[in-house]
Amino acid sequence: MRRHFFFAGMLAVGIGALGTGVAAGCGDKFVLIGRGVRVSRSQFPSSILIFMNPSSRVPAAEKDFHVEATLKAAGHKAVVVESEAEVQKALASGKYDLVLADVADAPALRKEASASASKPVVLPLLYKPTPEELSTAEKEANCMVRPSTKSRDLLAVVDETMKGRRNGTAAICDTAR
């Protein structure tokens, strides 16, 4: 009889200790901060250099649309650089398949990228372009990335470009075909 009360007492103490501690609510609650985002894994994971020129619109696009996080969630290796010196150093390493940059920086980056060992494709990023900028960009590039609320838009352009590159055909965004 004493043993029965002892085990009952120990059980009550154990439940009381576990029920009032930090672990009391584990797994039974969550906080919904925003809408969930589903990102499919890329069929063509790639190494992407993102040139976040402080004087361009890319930092604003990153803030609003989380470009780097979207790419990483899809299985890409995204690296952010903020200066031209960092871009040159990164391109010299020869590790990148794609360079994502503001539409204004793209022409100069194409020249640098073509001299790189890996010859990455430069994808121009358009964020809140003027009609003139949009028209000029459409003439210069076969494709471009426009941030949208749908992460699949960015990922579709990246995957299509990588598909062409991996198949040995001209990448979809190369200006010289």
What does each of the following model-derived ranges do?
Residues 98-118:
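Conserved phosphotransfer microenvironments
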Residues 68-94, 101-107:
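A short, well-structured beta->alpha microelement
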